Amino acid sequence: YEFTQLDFEVRNATSRDIMEFVEEILCGLLKSLKRDMQEELECLGRHGAIKVPSKPFRVYDRAELEEKHGKNWEMKIVQEAEEPFWVVNIPREFYDFEDFETGKWDNYDLFLPKYGEVLSGAKREWEYHKIVKKLDRDGVRKENFKLLLQLARENKIQPSAGAGIGIERLIAWIVRAKHIGDVQAFPKIPGAVYEL
């Protein structure tokens, strides 16, 4: 399945910096749409339906959600939510920052009510010894990451945080599309054949 994603990275940023930045961008986008795109929103049946969420967005810890709602916490909480929210501390790939002492991950996903996850991000690992330890622990082939390891060994990687946001997912949520393919110019959906 093909999709469009916007990725960004900020040197020396914290997770909180990125989360606040994303909240500003999302709220600003929704305000602009309400102000400048009234006619288009009316065509889509969304005029007056877009609400600008309050900041800061609520933050949940993934471990606590799983303990309270079980493995399928995502579907339950997404359906119950009225505004966008963050989920933090998600075990992921080696490049997300992990505190070995606490076992917590310094990362975050943004979820949209009734739709699901739209953005994933994290503070990044930059220290060579931690990257190698995590690659070994997770059984990841180091030769696949030669350049990254070389840069880390030479202390050429700076601390940073960033994220990637699914553009079509965001648009689908705004217009309440039934399927993400409905907001793609040229949807390529596995198993779907379109007549020309």
Regions found by a protein language model. Give the residues of each.
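A translation/RNA-centric and nucleic-acid-associated enzymatic feature enriched
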Residues: 1-31, 53-196
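Flexible helix-coil linker/hinge segments at domain or subdomain boundaries
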Residues: 28-43
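Short, highly charged C-terminal tails/helix-capping segments
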Residues: 39-55
